[in-house]
Amino acid sequence: MKKWIYVVLVLSIAGIGGFSVHAASSAHEKHLNVSKMNVDDEFKDTDGTFILHDLQKDQTFVYNRKRANQRQTPQSTFKVVNALIGLQVKAVRDEYDVKRWDGVKREFESWNRDHTLGSAMRESAIWYYQALARDIGEERMKTWLHTLSYGNEDISGGIDQFWLQSSLTISPLEQETFLEKLAKEELPFDKPVMKIVKRMMIQEEGDHYTLYGKTGTRLTDMGLGWFVGFIKTEHGSYVFVTNVDDSGTKAKNITVDILKKYGLITS
């Protein structure tokens, strides 16, 4: 009898302890004042900028504001815009629309196969989105980038190259403005189009959050990396932009570390 009482007590204490951890984490996020965040430790080995905007409280944190205002090439974060435009003008039907691999061996093995709009987003297969940009065409692309006020709106670098270390540039703060409108579904696209692209951006889902994002890397030297997106939690939504002198993977790792630190990503 005493043994069973002991087991019940241990299980009860463990349950209470687990609840306390979640409750503390949840409370941490609920009372988060993003304007008072500190991310110095996360950037001690990397030059970069980080932006977090609390959509409910309309509070914004910016680390390294000077860099946050500097325009740089969007790299593969432009896939988000490319997909939105492609779906809107019906250059592609949906996230399952297949393009056949042309047999050319490219940088990453995961690119060397047939892809859909969705799989090419997840694997960041550049060739698929280059083909999509050609299908959209210069005139429609110019019109839409102007409508969106997307960075400097310059596609002179070529219809399938302009976002890749070329003519199109955008600042991290401009990226945040664009992503905020996407998160709220306030961009000038049809609602189903925005929902499809947001679904393709899902990086991971937990019991209490969903993380949406897209990386971007300057492949010529791995010296420019982005991770942009938003996270939905039990208490609200937050838009983030990370830009570093490193790879997109590094930018994502820094972002996830910060989101965990402040209780937005919970186990």
Swiss-Prot record:
GO CC terms: plasma membrane
Pfam family, one: Transpeptidase
Catalysed reaction equations from the record: a beta-lactam + H2O = a substituted beta-amino acid
N6-carboxylysine PTM sites in chain numbering: 79
Binding site for substrate: 214-216
Active-site residues, Swiss-Prot/TrEMBL: 76
Enzyme nomenclature, EC number: 3.5.2.6
Highest taxon of source: Bacteria
Keywords from the UniProt entry: Antibiotic resistance, Hydrolase, Signal
Residues making up the signal peptide according to the UniProt record: 1-23
GO molecular function: beta-lactamase activity; penicillin binding
InterPro entries: Bact_Transpept/Beta-Lactamase, Beta-lactam/transpept-like, Beta-lactam_class-D_AS, PCN-bd_Tpept
First-level EC class: hydrolase
Biological process annotations from GO: antibiotic catabolic process; cell wall organization; response to antibiotic
Family the entry assigns: Belongs to the class-D beta-lactamase family.
PANTHER family (alphabetical): BETA-LACTAMASE YBXI-RELATED, PEPTIDOGLYCAN D,D-TRANSPEPTIDASE
Protein name in the entry: Probable beta-lactamase YbxI
